[in-house]
């Protein structure tokens, strides 16, 4: 739901399920299986709003891609009944596949769930609370089995340094793996590698779409820095520039330069995309993913950590 290829991705997973032994858990952005043939006033409003707002600004989402494939023109007057009939007839396998996904998968050693496990008796859990369970690692919960979750980008748990790698909390037995792929400008897709021998020596395979280059000269990192992120991203513009603007983070009073294109909402409350002024410690020969190329230097990512490099790249 956070990119232009949701329908293609769904078809890829359906094909993968036919060929190999794999399992999927349902997430809150995948919960469309009962939206195609059950007209209800509240649901009708939600579907229309979702389509007309381009998946809340993250689209086109899965339903819009289905509408495009079916030739349905989405506007404020589009026929919701025709929408249900057409998509239900054209994509029955897709909706059935989504409906077949469990919200929780439990094994002898692991529990897999998109958002997190609700509190209380599992017999009374609501599926939606398993799929959308914000800030699960911040709830102070502890488990006997490893609980592996996504949903809440790991960057939101960090401090003044932005890291997209999974967080493995060995005290609570929670692993959060959402690297903010597509949702974050510097996000990545994380795959947690679980050892066959049942040990806790977890591995990581990560992907991002950025070009990879090599550092030519070493750079000392550190120094004062901050990481402004979603949920706490209100800023005051001190001076505006064409490429960079000087801003003050409203909650902390911290001042930094950020890319002007990261500012939004300037007619009222001004906010910014996730940004940092962290200077990465790097050695000559280190490989980095280049997120932004600017007149001052490069916003890069090295081993999952985002920050600035002010030297030359090969």
For each predicted feature, which ranges?
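Acidic, His/Gly-enriched loop-helix segments that form or flank divalent-metal centers
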Residues: 73-174, 181-185, 197, 202-207, ...
């Amino acid at each position: 739901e956070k990119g232009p290829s949701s329908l293609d991705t769904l078809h890829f997973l359906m094909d993968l399920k036919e060929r190999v032994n794999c399992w999927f858990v349902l997430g809150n952005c995948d919960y469309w299986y009962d939206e195609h043939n059950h007209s209800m006033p509240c649901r009708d409003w939600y579907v229309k709003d979702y389509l007309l707002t381009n998946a809340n600004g993250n689209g086109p989402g899965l339903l819009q891609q289905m509408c495009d494939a079916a030739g349905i023109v989405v506007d404020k007057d589009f026929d919701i009944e025709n929408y249900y009939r057409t998509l239900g007839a054209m994509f029955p396998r897709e909706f059935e596949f989504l409906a077949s996904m469990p919200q929780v998968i439990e094994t002898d050693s692991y529990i897999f769930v998109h958002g997190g496990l609700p509190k209380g008796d599992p017999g009374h859990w609501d599926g939606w609370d398993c799929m959308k369970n914000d800030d699960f690692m911040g709830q102070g919960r502890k488990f006997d089995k490893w609980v592996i979750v996504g949903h809440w980008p790991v960057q939101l748990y960090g401090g003044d340094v932005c890291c997209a790698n999974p967080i493995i909390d060995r005290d609570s037995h929670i692993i959060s793996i959402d690297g903010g792929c597509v949702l974050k400008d510097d996000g990545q897709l994380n795959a947690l590698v679980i050892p066959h021998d049942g040990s806790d020596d977890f591995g990581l395979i990560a992907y991002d779409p950025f070009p990879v280059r090599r550092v030519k000269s070493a750079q000392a990192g550190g120094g004062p820095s901050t990481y402004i992120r979603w949920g706490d991203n209100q800023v005051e513009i001190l001076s505006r520039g064409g490429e960079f603007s000087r801003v003050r983070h409203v909650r902390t009073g911290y001042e930094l330069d950020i890319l002007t294109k990261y500012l939004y909402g300037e007619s009222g409350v001004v906010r910014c995309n996730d940004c940092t002024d962290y200077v990465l410690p790097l050695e000559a020969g280190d490989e980095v993913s280049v997120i932004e190329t600017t007149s001052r230097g490069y916003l890069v990512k090295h081993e999952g950590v985002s920050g600035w490099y002010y030297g030359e790249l090969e």
